């Protein structure tokens, strides 16, 4: 039998023998290598006896991971060339000029101001300067205002609170009629999280630094979101049996047994709470990655909106 390879002009002879009406290659033939004249492509045909299968496993998953890793490197390079990191002593006017340039650039779909800003800058003034159509962080006053109003939808929702609610949805947690408690009232997490829980028809309470006997409220919570950055503040005795706990807080504490002498913990005492709650997010690990995922989701939403893609 003659073989043909599309990149070769030379035919090759393979010896066959008949076994019960089926033509099979002779086991003695071991390998043929067919090359192009430019030696840029190689076709190797291995023929072995059926008694010794040793085919190479083509691992698509492993190769796909390598490709994704390569893409990550390229995306990182692009971010470095597109994004701007002003010097810490930059003036507010310089930062506003950068923001204005990104607002006007049609190739930019999202603008994010990394907080906190240096003390000599007016944080609210700079956040207000970001176009609401590109406010993928969701902190523009108009986006927060729409989030607070019934019948209005913000163009973007703040990423960490959005990630908390998305986690609950993906684990089929029921909201309607449930008692939800949010610890913390920051503009970044606490207040938006409370507003989102209200939109889900939960009955919401907010605990802050002036709340008396906070544990009395948390013991009633079917859903508890904590975002204050106080290590292990929420003890097991604060938790209603079967509650669902989302721990946004993260803080380093001393631990001689850990690398560097420190480890990261959340607001909720995980060891105690995990024995009482029906579901809990570990720290570090769950909410942080969800924040990044929601930022990417918001940026994709912005790009689709700009290009009128449904």
Swiss-Prot record:
One of its GO terms (molecular function) is methylenetetrahydrofolate dehydrogenase (NADP+) activity. It holds the Pfam family THF_DHG_CYH_C. Its EC number is 1.5.1.5, 3.5.4.9. It is found in: Plastid, Chloroplast. Residues 1-48 form a transit peptide. Pathway: One-carbon metabolism; tetrahydrofolate interconversion. InterPro entries: Aminoacid_DH-like_N_sf, NAD(P)-bd_dom_sf, THF_DH/CycHdrlase, THF_DH/CycHdrlase_cat_dom, THF_DH/CycHdrlase_NAD-bd_dom. It catalyses: (6R)-5,10-methylene-5,6,7,8-tetrahydrofolate + NADP(+) = (6R)-5,10-methenyltetrahydrofolate + NADPH; (6R)-5,10-methenyltetrahydrofolate + H2O = (6R)-10-formyltetrahydrofolate + H(+). One of its GO terms (cellular component) is chloroplast. The keyword Transit peptide applies. Keywords: Chloroplast, Hydrolase, Multifunctional enzyme, NADP, One-carbon metabolism, Oxidoreductase, Photorespiration, Plastid, Transit peptide. Coiled coil: none annotated. GO terms for biological process: photorespiration; tetrahydrofolate interconversion. Belongs to the tetrahydrofolate dehydrogenase/cyclohydrolase family. Catalyzes the oxidation of 5,10-methylenetetrahydrofolate to 5,10-methenyltetrahydrofolate and then the hydrolysis of 5,10-methenyltetrahydrofolate to 10-formyltetrahydrofolate. PANTHER family: C-1-TETRAHYDROFOLATE SYNTHASE, CYTOPLASMIC (PTHR48099:SF5), C-1-TETRAHYDROFOLATE SYNTHASE, CYTOPLASMIC-RELATED (PTHR48099). HAMAP family: THF_DHG_CYH. Homodimer. This is Bifunctional protein FolD 3, chloroplastic. It comes from Arabidopsis thaliana. The lineage of its organism: Eukaryota, Viridiplantae, Streptophyta, Embryophyta, Tracheophyta. The gene is FOLD3.
């Amino acid at each position: 039998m003659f073989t043909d390879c599309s990149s070769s002009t030379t035919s090759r002879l393979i010896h066959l023998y008949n076994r019960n009406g089926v033509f099979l290659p002779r086991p003695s033939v071991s390998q043929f290598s067919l090359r192009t004249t430019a030696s840029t492509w190689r076709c190797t045909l291995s023929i072995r006896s059926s008694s010794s299968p040793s085919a190479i496993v083509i691992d698509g998953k492993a190769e796909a991971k390598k490709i994704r890793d390569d893409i990550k490197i390229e995306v990182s390079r692009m971010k470095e060339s597109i994004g701007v990191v002003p010097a810490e002593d930059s003036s507010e006017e310089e930062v506003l000029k950068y923001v204005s340039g990104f607002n006007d650039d049609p190739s930019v779909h999202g603008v994010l101001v990394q907080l906190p800003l240096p003390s000599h800058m007016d944080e609210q003034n700079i956040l207000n300067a970001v176009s609401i159509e590109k406010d993928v962080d969701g902190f523009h006053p108009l986006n927060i205002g729409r989030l607070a109003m019934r019948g209005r939808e913000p163009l973007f929702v703040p990423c960490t609170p959005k990630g908390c609610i998305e986690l609950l949805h993906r684990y089929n947690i029921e909201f309607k009629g449930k008692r939800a408690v949010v610890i913390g009232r920051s503009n970044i997490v606490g207040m938006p999280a409370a507003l989102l829980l209200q939109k889900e028809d939960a009955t919401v309470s907010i605990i802050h630094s002036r709340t008396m006997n906070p544990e009395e409220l948390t013991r009633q919570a079917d859903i508890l979101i904590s975002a204050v950055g106080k290590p292990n503040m929420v003890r097991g005795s604060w938790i209603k049996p079967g509650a669902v706990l989302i721990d946004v807080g993260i803080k380093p504490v001393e631990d001689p047994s850990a690398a560097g002498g420190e480890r990261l913990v959340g607001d909720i005492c995980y060891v105690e709470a995990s024995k009482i709650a029906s579901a809990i997010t570990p720290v570090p690990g769950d909410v942080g990655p969800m924040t990044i995922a929601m930022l990417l989701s918001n940026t994709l939403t912005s790009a689709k909106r700009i290009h009128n893609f449904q």
